[in-house]
Amino acid sequence: MLSCQIQGNGQESIALCCDFLAQRLSICMDIKMRNTFEERRKELLQGHNTTWVNIFDSTCAYYYAVTGQTERIPTLFGAHMLSTVNFLAPGRPMMEMIENQVYLAQGEYSKVIGRSESILAMCQALHYDLVALHVQIQLLAANWKLGKTEQALELLRRSLSQAFPDGILMPFVE
C-alpha cells in the first residue's frame, strides 16, 4: 500500500491522505486497513503535531458520518467546534464539507442547507470542484430528507452533469 511506503519518509501529510482514501474505499470495497483508527491516532499523538491529529480526526469524522456511526465522530466535529481550530485557508472548504456531512448524519438537514451556500462560495473561490460536488450532494440529500424533492432532483441533475464527464463516481457512492 502506498501509505506504507510513505510512512517513515517524513511525508505524514501524504500518509494522512492515503489513510483517508483507504477509509473511504473500505466503505464499498474489501480493503485491509494498516491500523485501526485508534492505533493510527495514537501514532499521530506521539508526533505532538496537532495539525496532523486534527486532519486525522476530520477523516474519521467523515468516515463515521458516512457510515452512520455518529456516536464515534470525534468531538471536534461531533460537537461542532470546528470554528475553534485554525486551518490554513486552502483546507477550510474540505473541513467545512466534512462538518456538513456530520450535520447530515445527525439529521440536521436545515443546518446543511443553511451552511452550503457559503461553503460552495469558498469552493468556487479556490476552484475546489470536487469538494463543491460533495457539498451539492449533501445539499440535495438534505432537501430530499425535508421533502423538497424538486430542489433535490435539480441538484442531482446538476451534480450528475458536472461529475459524469470526468467519470467521478465516488461522491455519489458515499
Regions found by a protein language model. Name each.
Residues 5-21, 31-32, 44-60, 83-98, ...:
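Alpha-solenoid helical repeat architecture
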Residues 1-3, 31-44, 69-83, 110-120, ...:
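Alpha-helical repeat scaffolds
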Residues 59-68:
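Basic/polar, acidic-poor N-terminal "presequence/leader" segments
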Residues 73, 93, 100-104, 118, ...:
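Residue-level detection of beta-strand scaffold positions
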